[in-house]
């Protein structure tokens, strides 16, 4: 009510309304297209354009652009952040929203063009020069060649690119620039006119070998994505201490593509003049494990971290007092290619080399420690167990009748008549004139592989993920016991490649009973999700079974990852390879997940029809038996 009395706040709000939103590109919010709404469609387009199936689509982060700003922008904030499209080996980074044109279809077409462009981008291009001028010119040359390649490979994109170039020409701002910057801008406009099939009267320009002092890069063109090369870093020797999940995970943030950089004190400014305000100087207290001086909300802290260009990360021991969710996509660690010596070792697939890393993962197999009390189920869950058992009893094999046997309880009349006719015709009769009945052979072996990584300690809809998994596992195990299928239950978690723990809840030759129920109740959240090694171990155990049909049913709540190099595309490619190896050995692989965002990577891992997404966690105990009946039938 009396906010107008705060002169500084009032003037600040008025100033922000006046010139706070003065971006280089115009924005048309009424015609905006959101990436989250069309990401699945764009993923299909990327695969259709020949892109690798394991490459993921993520929102690009708005980063500070160093191009020359107009007067109003310099007066407002002194910088401009742009969500420029980028690509690396594992990710397509697209703007979270495109509202560049006053036509929604054009904004959508820009997304499609970016996906087609990135599908043919040269991933082995040399790094751009350090000099700003030469970097601009090299980027324009790469863009020209890539546009030509995309239009030649996909002729249907050419009319779309023509319309986009004409629209970009109309929207690109005209700003006062230095002479050399004007020449680079003229080169950009010339390329856009060529794309739009417009006459171009620009003369060729000879550029110097280096840009002069004061040269600033050109304003990026949204049509031409950049290539991000991120070098691997040396493996860390220390162990990460996982942080237990709380009931509130906080708001979801976009994946932030980042670089690991070590600060070198020799590069610090050693000027004797203190020109900075003292509150901007980095204080030691910021890096010391002490109580924070204010009660800022974790949600606000997450939002503030999301807006930072530089975020200082450190390692600490012990459990922090508070945390927030922040998906930071750091470049992977270098792969340690040394061989491991252990009782059970499995290879790992390195997609970059196109070869296996032999004896790369050590699996520690052990039984689950039993708990004194079984899992306590409420009345609804107990009713579900009884209902599932009745449904699965129908699937129990009946007795099959064998005809023309040497011995049996009844005569096979057809065989008796046939034998008497043979004798009457002067032939030899047969003694196989009896009927025998026996139980039908149960020809299915199934392994339930359950992810018990740290993420299962999270709470969704006021229920812990692991508790719901236990309930679903207990319901399904009762059903499988009722139908008589041979079944084993394994859990897995990991902490680097030397410690992949696979525990046995139930073995194939073990009957379901109180002991197994106690083991299910004893399941606890572990660490990380090295899915490939666990799947290879489960496949090896299934391959030893004599049954003709084999099924590996994976229950997980997230995508594969570990604390070392096993993350991002490396983890996806290895897990996909492990699923392919299992199918090549005659093992059917099917995944069930409760991760609501898993639709982005599950098709790449298990293929079409190889997975099921249970969006509502509470429905997992009902959905899992239904999925099993479909697969077993």
UniProtKB/Swiss-Prot annotation:
Keywords: Virulence
Record keyword Ligase present: no
Record-annotated disulphide pairs: none
Pfam families: VWA
Gene3D superfamilies xref list: von Willebrand factor, type A domain
Chain residue ranges for the region called Disordered: 232-270, 290-314
Domain VWFA positions: 445-631
Coiled coil: none
Biased composition (Basic and acidic residues): 232-243, 258-270, 292-306
Highest rank taxon of the organism: Bacteria
Function: Part of the operon norEFCBQD encoding nitric oxide reductase. Essential virulence factor, probably involved in the detoxification of nitric oxide (NO) produced in the macrophages during the innate response against infection.
Protein name listed in UniProt: Protein NorD
The organism of origin for this protein: Brucella suis biovar 1 (strain 1330)
């Amino acid at each position: 009510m009396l906010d107008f009395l705060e002169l500084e706040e009032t003037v600040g709000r008025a100033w922000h309304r006046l010139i706070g939103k003065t971006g280089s590109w115009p924005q048309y919010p009424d015609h905006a297209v959101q990436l989250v709404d069309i990401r699945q469609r764009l993923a299909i387009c990327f695969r259709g354009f020949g892109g690798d199936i394991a490459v993921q689509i993520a929102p690009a982060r708005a980063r500070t652009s160093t191009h020359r700003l107009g007067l109003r922008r310099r007066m407002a904030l002194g910088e401009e952040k742009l969500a420029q499209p980028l690509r690396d080996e594992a990710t397509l980074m697209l703007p979270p929203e495109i509202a560049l044109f006053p036509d929604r279809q054009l904004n959508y077409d820009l997304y499609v063009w970016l996906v087609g462009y990135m599908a043919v981008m040269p991933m082995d291009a040399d790094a751009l020069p350090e000099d700003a001028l030469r970097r601009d010119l090299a980027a324009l040359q790469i863009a020209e060649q890539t546009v030509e390649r995309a239009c030649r490979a996909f002729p249907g994109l050419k009319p779309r690119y023509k319309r986009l170039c004409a629209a970009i020409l109309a929207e690109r701002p005209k700003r006062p620039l230095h002479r050399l910057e004007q020449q680079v801008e003229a080169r950009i406009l010339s390329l856009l006119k060529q794309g739009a099939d417009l006459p171009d009267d620009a003369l060729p320009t000879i550029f110097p070998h280096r840009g002069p002092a004061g040269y600033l890069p050109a304003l990026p063109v949204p049509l031409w994505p950049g290539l991000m090369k991120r070098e691997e870093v040396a493996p860390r020797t220390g162990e990460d201490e996982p942080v237990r999940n709380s009931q509130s995970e906080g708001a979801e943030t976009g994946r932030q593509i980042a670089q690991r950089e070590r600060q070198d004190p020799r590069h610090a400014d050693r000027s004797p003049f203190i020109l900075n305000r003292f509150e901007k100087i980095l204080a030691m207290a910021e890096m010391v494990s002490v109580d924070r001086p204010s009660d800022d909300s974790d949600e606000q802290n997450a939002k503030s971290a999301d807006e930072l260009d530089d975020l200082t990360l450190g390692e600490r021991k012990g459990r922090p007092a508070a945390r927030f969710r922040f998906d930071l996509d750091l470049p992977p660690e270098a792969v340690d290619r040394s061989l491991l010596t252990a009782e059970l070792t499995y290879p790992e697939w390195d997609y970059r080399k196109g070869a296996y890393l032999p004896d790369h993962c050590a699996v520690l197999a052990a039984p689950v420690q039993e708990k004194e009390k079984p899992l306590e189920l409420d009345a609804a869950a107990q009713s579900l167990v009884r209902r599932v058992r009745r449904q699965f009893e129908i699937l129990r094999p009946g007795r099959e009748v064998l005809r023309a046997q040497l011995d049996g309880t009844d005569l096979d009349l057809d065989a008796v008549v046939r034998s008497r006719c043979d004798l009457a015709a002067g032939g030899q009769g047969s003694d196989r004139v009896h009927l025998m009945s026996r139980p039908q052979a149960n020809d299915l072996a199934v392994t339930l592989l359950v992810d018990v990584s740290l993420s299962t300690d999270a709470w969704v809809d006021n229920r812990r993920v692991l508790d719901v998994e236990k309930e679903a596992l207990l319901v399904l195990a009762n059903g499988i016991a009722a139908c008589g299928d041979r079944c084993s239950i394994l859990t897995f978690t990991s902490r680097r490649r030397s410690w992949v723990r696979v525990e046995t809840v139930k073995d194939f030759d073990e009957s379901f009973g109180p002991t197994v129920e106690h083991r299910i109740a004893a399941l606890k959240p572990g660490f990380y999700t090295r899915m490939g090694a666990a799947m290879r171990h489960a496949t090896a155990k299934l391959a030893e079974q004599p049954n003709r049909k084999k099924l590996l049913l994976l229950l997980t709540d997230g995508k594969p990852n570990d604390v070392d190099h096993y993350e991002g595309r490396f983890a996806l490619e290895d897990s996909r390879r492990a699923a392919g190896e299992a199918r090549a050995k005659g093992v059917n692989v099917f995944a069930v997940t409760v991760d609501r965002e898993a639709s982005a990577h599950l098709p790449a891992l298990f293929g079409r029809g190889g997975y099921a997404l249970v969006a509502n966690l509470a429905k997992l105990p009902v959905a899992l038996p239904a999925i099993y009946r479909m697969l077993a039938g």
